[in-house]
A protein has these predicted regions:
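A helix-centric hydrophobic-segment signal that preferentially recognizes long
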Residues: 2-199
């Protein structure tokens, strides 16, 4: 074997190793993207669970809070807005506009729920209703699960974005059309606190 053949073989080995490294980077970006999309799917499950609880809360309260029709309707409207934003975000997890719209809708829903629960405290019979107590306990549990799922999503997005922004991952991300994903950031300080459910 001549020196030229050995050199050519060495270059070939280096090229193959480099290509394998690039494939590994690409596959890592795909895995990280799938992780943050799965993390959003976990949020999605909890949000749907909460959206399903809200009409039951309102229906339970209707008989006691007949004079608070405006508040009850505001809660349902905020829920419907949040559901629409969640549907768009679940189709585009990590999309900046979708996540911003979801955040805004969730702020509106949290505000409506807090007003509703604040008014519900003025109705002693409602406060004592076992169904209402069970629904509120379930809502509190779901709010906690949403918070944990949101944190897991944001962590997964940070890992993905870091891989897309650091060298040499940024080169592979550019060729592979991997876009930076948006965190689910809460736009208002009040939204950082879970819905206050206390009876």
């Amino acid at each position: 074997m001549t020196g030229f053949m050995i050199g050519l073989l060495a270059v070939g080995v280096v090229v193959v190793l480099f290509l394998m490294y690039l494939v590994g980077l690409y596959n890592n970006l795909v895995a990280l993207k799938n992780r943050f999309q799965n993390a959003f799917a976990q949020i999605d499950v909890q949000l749907k669970r909460r959206y399903d609880l809200i009409p039951n809360l309102v229906e339970t309260a209707k008989g006691y809070m007949a004079h608070e029709k405006e508040t009850l309707e505001a809660v349902i409207q905020a829920r419907n807005g949040a559901m629409a934003a969640e549907k768009h975000a679940s189709a585009n997890p990590g999309d900046a506009k979708a996540m911003s719209n979801l955040s805004t809708a969730e702020v509106a829903l949290a505000g409506s729920l807090n007003r509703f629960i604040g008014l519900a405290e003025a109705y002693p019979d409602l406060k004592a209703n076992q169904n209402m107590l069970a629904l509120q306990e379930e809502l509190t549990s779901t709010e906690n699960k949403v918070s944990f799922a949101r944190q897991a999503f944001n962590d997964a997005v940070m890992n993905y974005n870091t891989a897309c922004e650091t060298f040499p991952g940024n080169v592979v991300a550019g060729f592979g059309n991997f876009q930076k994903a948006a965190l689910w950031e809460l736009s208002e300080p009040a939204q950082r606190e879970p819905v206050q459910v206390k009876f």
